[in-house]
Amino acid sequence: MHQQHTLERAMRRALQLAGNGPAEGVNPRVGCVILSPAGEIIAEGWHRGAGTCHAEVDALARLDPADARGATAVVTLEPCNHTGRTGPCALALIDAGIGRVVYAVADPGPHSSGGGDRLRAAGIDVAGGLLADEVAAFLADWLVSARLGRPFVTVKWASSLDGRAAAADGTSQWITGPAARRDVHERRARADAILVGTGTALADDPSLTARAAD
């Protein structure tokens, strides 16, 4: 059994790997590392977007099958129990002979959840909740969509100290500085859609793109 600090270090590495995946799209960003019985990282993987292999399968593909038997998979999200464009990760871990699975956040999806129970039924030791707060913060956008069945919405509002959004004569182009504009475009790049009101569309004809700050 691995010590707590070994598992936490592995989970933070898995979270770092998850950040390599695309921020937009319906699938969550997930990372996975596989530990040897000695606690060494012997394989890593992450999800690269809808239709590609999930993090657990990506990690297993980089590992000699003999080394997978009895190893520990540390993954940021509970392995899925769903067949879509790819097969269920829980089954892939079972077939590979993984001995233990440690995950951070339970999968709330109505179709993809239940992977932990499937793993336990196959005799695999399963533990959830490791660094759950850190991973949940990283997955906040996706978790809202998965739990509530609606998009995660970010409202952008810029105003001056006296509560104004533009000059009264309409001559102002921006009231924010370069740092704020850069932040907005970084957020746009991570979003699936950009919306504005009718007034803004008519007055500014905005391009609604993600680009470098002007």
Question: What residue spans do the PLM features occupy?
Answer:
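Short, basic/aromatic recognition patches
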Residues: 6-25, 142-145
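Conserved hydrophobic "DFG−1" position in protein kinase catalytic cores
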Residues: 10, 34-35, 159
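Residue-level signal for inorganic ion chemistry
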Residues: 14, 31, 80, 119, ...
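Proteins enriched for Cys/Gly/acidic motifs involved in redox and nucleic-acid/cofactor modification
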Residues: 23-24, 52, 116, 130-160, ...
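Short loop/turn microsegments at loop-to-beta-strand junctions
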Residues: 28-31, 42, 153-155
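Zn2+-dependent cytidine deaminase-like catalytic core
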Residues: 33-134
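Active-site ligand-binding patch in enzyme domains
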Residues: 66, 144-145, 150-157, 161-214
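Structural motif corresponding to alpha-helix initiation and N-cap regions
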Residues: 86-87, 132, 136-140, 177-181
